Amino acid sequence: VPVTDENQTSGWVSTETIVDAPYRNTTEDQLRAQFAREWRTGATLETYILASQANKVLNGRYLDERLTCSILLGSRFEGGPVMGQFYTNGFLLVSALLAPGGHTRSLGGRSEGGR
């Protein structure tokens, strides 16, 4: 089963460039509410990969490099959002978010878009 995107983004896209995941210790529902307040949507896996590669070139580190993971509400696998994390060697770990109500200090979320 492939990963599918909820958002179809084209052109310029803004996203967070902070290395450690923003919005940590929030649930899937809390992330959706936060992004809606900011006129943003959950980042897709494609946006996450592109932003992380750009961050590596510009700042020397991948997004979520080893210490945090990001929920990517814009991409889904078997009905639920996916999580992403990069390692220092550029390896990308993508997994399904198992519990929508789950939250930890090392798990955050990333958004895209903007006003």
Question: Which residues make up each language-model segment?
Answer:
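A binding-site-centric feature that preferentially detects glycan-recognition modules on secreted/surface proteins
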Residues: 1-41, 45-115
